[in-house]
Amino acid sequence: MEETMNNQEAPETSEEETVAVENTKAEKVLPNFGPGDTIKVHARIKEGDKERIQMFQGVVLKVKQAADGGNFTVRRISYGVGVERTFPFLSPNVTKVEIMKKGRVRRARLFYLRKLSGKAARIKEVKQTPS
C-alpha cells in the first residue's frame, strides 16, 4: 500500500501557487473605491471554448479586505430584478474596474438598498473638486 502512495505525485501547491498569487498581487492595481460608489467591472467570461469581456455596472454594496485579497459586491437592477455579483480582488477574471461616480454614504455595508427601489435607492454623489 505504501508503494502505491509513493508512486502518486502530490500536487505541488506550496511554491508554484504562492509565486502565482504573489505575481497576481503585484500586477493587480485597482482604483480606490468603497461602498456607495458606482463602478463598472470588466469581467472575463468563458463560454465553451470562447472568451469575452462582460461589463457589470452597479453600486458597491460592500468591500471586504483580507490577507488573501478580499472581495467586493456590486448590485444593479436588470429588467426590474436586482442582480448582485461578488468579485475577488485578485481574480484573473477581473480585467479592469472603472469608477463611474463616487457616492456619499455613512455605512460600510449597504444591504438596506436591497429593500429600496426607485428614487429611494438613490445615493448622493460626491462632487469632485478640480485639482
UniProtKB/Swiss-Prot annotation:
Compositional bias per record (Polar residues), positions renumbered to this chain: 1-11
Signal sequence extent: none
Region of interest (Disordered), ranges: 1-20
GO molecular function list: structural constituent of ribosome
InterPro entries reported for this sequence: Ribosomal_bL19 (IPR001857), Ribosomal_bL19_CS (IPR018257), Ribosomal_bL19_sf (IPR038657), Translation_prot_SH3-like_sf (IPR008991)
Top-rank taxon, per record: Bacteria
A GO term from the CC aspect: cytosolic large ribosomal subunit
Pfam family, any one: Ribosomal_L19
Keyword annotations: Ribonucleoprotein, Ribosomal protein
GO biological process terms held by the UniProt record: translation
Gene3D superfamilies tied to this protein: 2.30.30.790
Job of this protein: This protein is located at the 30S-50S ribosomal subunit interface and may play a role in the structure and function of the aminoacyl-tRNA binding site.
Family: Belongs to the bacterial ribosomal protein bL19 family.
PANTHER family listed in its UniProt record: LARGE RIBOSOMAL SUBUNIT PROTEIN BL19M, RIBOSOMAL PROTEIN L19
Designated name of the protein: Large ribosomal subunit protein bL19
Organism: Dehalococcoides mccartyi (strain ATCC BAA-2100 / JCM 16839 / KCTC 5957 / BAV1)
